[in-house]
Amino acid sequence: MTRSGSRGEELPVTLFRIDISGDVSEYSGDISNPTGIAFSPDGQMFVSSRLEGVVYRLNPFKEAVAFARNLGVATGIAFDPQGVMYVGDRTGTIFRINGIGEERTWTQIEPSVSAFHLAFGPDDSLYVSAPTVTSFDVIWRINRDGDTDIFFKGLGRPQGLAFDRDGNLYVAAALRGRRGIVRISADGSDAKLIAAGVNLVGLAFSAAGEMAVVSIDSVYSLPVQIKGTLLPE
């Protein structure tokens, strides 16, 4: 979990580890304004710094080593099923990063006032939330060629994303004026608020079927019995 702080703020610890029992431990303080976390298919941990425009790789000694640079306001990170990294610059660019950290612009979408959140769906498309100041924000869907379309429209400030094994998409967002976790059907035709909450920014599923929901200052565990997807198999 990241503790990003305000832009340029120096914090003694910016990454934390929460185990399955809910115990919190300090992990690393080497990265300023960390925002996105993703694990590669071989289990390596990568973290973006929105201050520096850099994605770092955490080595076994919990030291941060720069992996990719020149990524603008680097926020969300995701790996496709082939293990290729994608990084969202909230000013409007999605970068594709090769295995040695070289970046190239993959596609452009509208900028965000907060952060890009990225997740690959069961169709191998990249799904992106990019919150703005409207109440009709969209979830972008980007195919393997970098072509974009709107998967769903009508959310307020959508942020963290996660898929379940049935292809449903879960988003920390507001729907019809109510804030919480929204479930969007696999075909994008229907959306429903399944858990209410304010100031929610992210979510993830555990192997036990629990949903971890993150607010600006807390982490909650919901026993929803939903199996999620995390890494390519």
Model-derived segments and their meaning:
Residues 1-233:
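Sequence-structural signature of mature extracellular/luminal beta-sheet repeat domains
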